[in-house]
Amino acid sequence: MALSRVCWARSAVWGSAVTPGHFVTRRLQLGRSGLAWGAPRSSKLHLSPKADVKNLMSYVVTKTKAINGKYHRFLGRHFPRFYVLYTIFMKGLQMLWADAKKARRIKTNMWKHNIKFHQLPYREMEHLRQFRQDVTKCLFLGIISIPPFANYLVFLLMYLFPRQLLIRHFWTPKQQTDFLDIYHAFRKQSHPEIISYLEKVIPLISDAGLRWRLTDLCTKIQRGTHPAIHDILALRECFSNHPLGMNQLQALHVKALSRAMLLTSYLPPPLLRHRLKTHTTVIHQLDKALAKLGIGQLTAQEVKSACYLRGLNSTHIGEDRCRTWLGEWLQISCSLKEAELSLLLHNVVLLSTNYLGTRR
């Protein structure tokens, strides 16, 4: 009995201290307080993945721009000459990348709509032609940079030989003027040689009137006179068949014409002849597209580039004079048929040699 009373007393004491109701209430309070501070954590963990990626990318871009700005300021203060070259190189890469995207867009449009090259507008035709030429020049750098550690040698060669290895995007404004003058000096060296070849074939022309006209034209050019359009067009028959047709030109004559077009002359004569045909055909197609567009629609830079491509050193000639010369060229080019393209090829020499101050 005593033992049972003791047990009953202990249970009474513990029961009064911790009642079931108080225990349940305490558990509920803990659960509610846990929900109260745990809800925001669960909301943060369930943010949209797209928002997280967007915020991360924005942060990375901001930090990259800040670091890039500090790097540019450091180069500008401590290495000013290198900074100029670095800036030109980076801008050149951006322009080349923009050209590549535009060329791809044009090619995609041609493929979708089954458009041929000669059916394109003038600016798109010229862009593809120039981009193809730039890629061909860059291809050499890509090949020589393939061996391990050769890229260091490539950078050195690019610095030492910018005219030979780099395209126009990576030239300074002064380099552009100087290099264009150098290239024009190269092609002008072949002008007297081409005129002498024309004089040599005069006895082979059967028509006496054509012989006299060609002799008179060569004499005018040698004396420094700029020929008239009708003087050149009068010789169309001469350049459509023997001895001045594209397929009848002598090997040395073809090499001289290749140099006048700034094409390599160190290829077998059949390949040189094929390249000249292709190059002249492209220029003829460009001329037709330009005549349709109108010279007045071109910017000053586009006019000068078009004149330089066709043999005129436009870097030292005013815009109005360049437009006048380009109009003369188009008048001759658009009057020629495909069989008479040899005359258009020789027109690079005939029409540009004595125009204004180009004879030096």
Swiss-Prot record:
Topological type in the membrane: Single-pass membrane protein
Required and sufficient for mitochondrial import: annotated span: 1-110
GO cellular component, one term: nucleoplasm
Presence of the UniProt keyword Nucleus in the record: yes
Summary of the tissues where the protein is detected: Kidney, liver, skeletal muscle, heart and brain. Overexpressed in various tumors including leukemia, lymphoma, and carcinomas of the breast, kidney, ovary, stomach, colon and uterine cervix.
BP GO annotations: ATP biosynthetic process; gene expression; inflammatory response; mitochondrial calcium ion homeostasis; mitochondrion organization; non-canonical NF-kappaB signal transduction; phagocytosis; positive regulation of cold-induced thermogenesis
Keyword Protease: no
Residues exposed to the Cytoplasmic side: 1-137
Compartments (UniProt record): Mitochondrion outer membrane; Nucleus; Mitochondrion inner membrane
GO molecular function: molecular adaptor activity; ribosome binding
Mitochondrial intermembrane compartment spans: 159-360
Keyword field: Membrane, Mitochondrion, Mitochondrion inner membrane, Mitochondrion outer membrane, Nucleus, Proto-oncogene, Transmembrane, Transmembrane helix
Cited InterPro entries: LETM1-like_RBD (IPR033122), LETM1/MDM38-like (IPR044202)
Spans through the membrane: 138-158
Domain Letm1 RBD residue range list: 186-360
Highest rank taxon of the organism: Eukaryota
UniProt function note: Plays an essential role for mitochondrial structure and function, as well as thermogenesis of brown adipocytes. In brown adipose tissue also localizes in the nucleus where it interacts with the chromatin remodeler SMARCA4 to regulate thermogenic genes expression, such as UCP1. May regulate phagocytosis and inflammatory responses to lipopolysaccharide in macrophages. Involved in tumorigenesis and may function as a negative regulator of the p53/TP53.
Binding partners and assembly: Interacts with BRI3BP. Interacts (via C-terminal) with SMARCA4; the interaction regulates transcriptional expression of thermogenic genes in brown adipose tissue.
Protein name (database record): LETM1 domain-containing protein 1
Native source organism of the sequence: Homo sapiens
